[in-house]
Amino acid sequence: MLAVALAIFAGATARLFVWPGSGAPSRVDAVLMMAGPDAPLSTAVRLARMHKARFLLISRGHEGYGGPCPQPVPRVRLICFEPDPATTQGEAEYAGRLARKYHWRSIMLVTITPQEWRARQRMGRCFRGSVYGAAGGIPWYSWPYQIAYEWGATVKMLVVQREC
């Protein structure tokens, strides 16, 4: 019985946090970089330079935790912000407000691999359009901490914070 429970836990961990998988279209209305350790700013800027979206949103997290606002990209509207609250929930709420204001139909979230599934779920609660993910890697030594963190944050999202 314990072996079955461990196998289910390992399978869920792999599916949700290691290989979350969410194909992306060639263009979306906005790209949102989520703040955090190892924030994949270079991935978000690369997508903007490839003109994958008309808007590039950079979450600076709490006290600029997401890093500095990058240089503007021609023909892409750059919006750097500090979410309130300074969490994935706050990022989703802010992006959801902008989506309603600008009538977006799709958004791509740029985050670290372990956070991608949860970030898409949160964004889906605040935005009625299509939500895609583009994940950046993390150092191998970060995986144990990130998986433990994501399990806790996922339970919180599913049990405590059930709405946008």
Predicted features and spans:
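A transmembrane-helix-recognition feature enriched in membrane-embedded lipid enzymes
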Residues: 143-163
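A structural signal for short, hydrophobic/glycine-enriched beta-strand patches
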Residues: 14-148
